[in-house]
């Protein structure tokens, strides 16, 4: 993947297209968490891809490509939300959440007991499979803060499930 990123940085359009295709599912899921509207998601993805293409030469370290790409997307999503002047609630999950004990509807209700920030961290960690380090970069938080919030969210969810 590093070689592909380097090729894209050097102007290889096909390499760039392959990079975007490799990350399309993560891009869509992240945009869905923020926007939950297909038209807004399409706009955010289009703007993100264009911005990434125009600025990929500025990427300092290839190992941070995905984090950099996701940061661009999150900023685009926030811009769209500001333009529409509505709050981003994260109570819907991406399809494909599987749990033997809880169905999707129950998961949605369960996560509502968390504050927005903790809910976002839990979703990025468990459903989008981001690492704590990636989440800290995406949300511009210290990784220890992300770990603490994740731990507290787990504890709160366990407590609610036991009731």
Predicted features along the sequence, with ranges:
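C-terminal flanking helix
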Residues: 24, 28, 49, 115, ...
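Internal acidic/polar
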Residues: 79, 83-112, 131
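Sigma70-family region 2
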Residues: 9, 36, 47-64, 84-85
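A short pre-motif secondary-structure segment
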Residues: 121-125
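DNA-recognition helix of helix-turn-helix
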Residues: 74, 78, 127, 133-163
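Arg/Lys-rich amphipathic alpha helix in sigma70-family domain 2
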Residues: 57-60, 71-90, 152
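N-terminal module of bacterial RNA polymerase sigma factors
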Residues: 1-25, 107-108, 112, 138-139, ...
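Structural recognition of an alpha-helix C-terminal capping motif at a helix-to-coil junction
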Residues: 29, 43-50, 54, 63-75
């Amino acid at each position: 993947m590093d070689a592909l990123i380097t090729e894209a940085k050097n102007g290889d359009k096909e390499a760039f297209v392959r990079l975007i295709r490799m990350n399309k599912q993560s891009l869509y899921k992240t945009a869905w968490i923020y926007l939950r509207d297909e038209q807004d998601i399409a706009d955010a993805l289009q703007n993100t891809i264009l911005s990434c293409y125009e600025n990929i030469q500025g990427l300092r370290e290839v190992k941070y490509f995905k984090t950099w790409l996701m940061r661009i997307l999150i900023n685009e999503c926030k811009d769209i939300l500001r333009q529409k002047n509505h709050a981003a609630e994260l109570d819907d999950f991406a399809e494909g959440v599987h749990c033997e004990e809880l169905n999707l509807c129950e998961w949605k209700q369960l996560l509502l007991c968390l504050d927005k920030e903790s809910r976002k961290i839990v979703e990025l960690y468990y459903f989008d499979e981001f690492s704590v380090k990636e989440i800290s970069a995406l949300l511009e938080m210290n990784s220890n803060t992300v770990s603490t919030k994740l731990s507290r969210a787990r504890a709160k969810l366990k407590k609610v499930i036991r009731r």
